[in-house]
UniProtKB/Swiss-Prot annotation:
Region spans: Disordered: 1-25
Gene Ontology CC annotation, any one: plasma membrane
Domain of life: Bacteria
Alphabetical list of Pfam families matching this protein: DUF2254
Subcellular location: Cell membrane
Transmembrane feature ranges: 68-88, 114-134, 160-180, 192-212, 290-310, 399-419
Native species: Mycobacterium tuberculosis (strain ATCC 25618 / H37Rv)
Alphabetically ordered keywords of this record: Cell membrane, Membrane, Transmembrane, Transmembrane helix
Entry protein name: Uncharacterized protein Rv1290c
Amino acid sequence: MLQRSLGVNGRKLAMSARSAKRERKNASTAASKCYVVPPSARGWVHAYSVTATSMLNRRKAILDYLQGAVWVLPTFGVAIGLGSGAVLSMIPVKSGTLIDKLMFQGTPGDARGVLIVVSATMITTIGIVFSLTVLSLQIASSQFSVRLLRTFLRDVPNQVVLAIFACTFAYSTGGLHTVGEHRDGGAFIPKVAVTGSLALAFVSIAALIYFLHHLMHSIQIDTIMDKVRLRTLGLVDQLYPESDTADRQVETPPSPPADAVPLLAPHSGYLQTVDVDDIAELAAASRYTALLVTFVGDYVTAGGLLGWCWRRGTAPGAPGSDFPQRCLRHVHIGFERTLQQDIRFGLRQMVDIALRALSPALNDPYTAIQVVHHLSAVESVLASRALPDDVRRDRAGELLFWLPYPSFATYLHVGCAQIRRYGSREPLVLTALLQLLSAVAQNCVDPSRRVAVQTQIALVVRAAQREFADESDRAMVLGAAARATEVVERPGTLAPPPSTFGQVAAAQAAASTIRSADRDG
């Protein structure tokens, strides 16, 4: 009887588990995430879930800070070097063995001299490496963009090389205090420690050579643009994983009720990240709704409006006095923009490189054209993705939290507007923008996005007609605009090859203009 009862109960539990698994799977395929908290367990479930998610978000924030902190890995290197140097100095080596023959052979004075030379050399090398690093930061800020400094600070190879040098210095210093100690009336030579110091010296030489190689490549404009492009595309995949479809339904945020309470910024700064899951779970457990009206990446002033919150249910009302404060704990405002949830910042970094290249001080339009090529890769992916706001609802369909994201037209404007204005005197820059717009239009399935592309094409045409006095320059841009417009107006049309927008098109337009002038003459 007991076994039969256990078997029946086991089958019931298994069926219940399979049913719960199916429910979780169905819920995960819904358009927005759902949060259901039983009333009897609301308190402890909410406390556990929000605490766990907050810890994960806090870990991400700490990890993001540590990746950009230059002192972290060198500090670990110093600690490891001091510890290993002191420990290896206490390891004796039996005289006459094979290991003894491989170890350092010399007097205590020789051992002390080796350790001192290695330590002094590492201090000098660390100073050189720091100087070269600061020089690369200066070049990046003056030649490319000040907003790229964060990318250089997050460069792991530089931090690893500094850690190796710091470890070698600390290791050699840690073994110095044991040289010359007398054991049984004889001088003690830390052969293992001295041999390790020599080995670390050769490792440091290899690290220095690699550092110089890496530094020379890292300050190249192509490497910088590729890093920014890849990081931005990674964020696009994270925020917008689904492809766009022609029958996609666009949700619009609700209007806050009259008794909604404003969510005000606690201090001035850039809206860096929002813990969407935390706020949704908080709203699910408290039966509130929160709506943000500020995009991630926007600058807010202290006391400025971030959003609204109100009570859900049949009898709406203002939330309790502590709900806005609890909600604002999961809205992070900082002194700088980051790429954690802000795609526009990745576009801004690339646009800044183009603007600096188009400035009279540099006058490097080809670099601006390269930036446009990298921007086309990001904008084309954005054109092919569904760009919904981040919405959280419960199983009943009631809104828990709404985080707005910029529209496709906004992303396209960020990538094209300033380059069009500052590059309006260079026809190849404008034709590169038209090449970008034709590639974007090829991936658009939403008619409203095609309208946004057509608007940008019209703005490029107006800039060309206003700025270019030479007929061949104007003809080249207008011809490229006509080809891009054809892609916009005929869905399914492939974008023309790059040769129709670049130097080949420029040469053809110039030759055609000269022939027309000769015939007219």
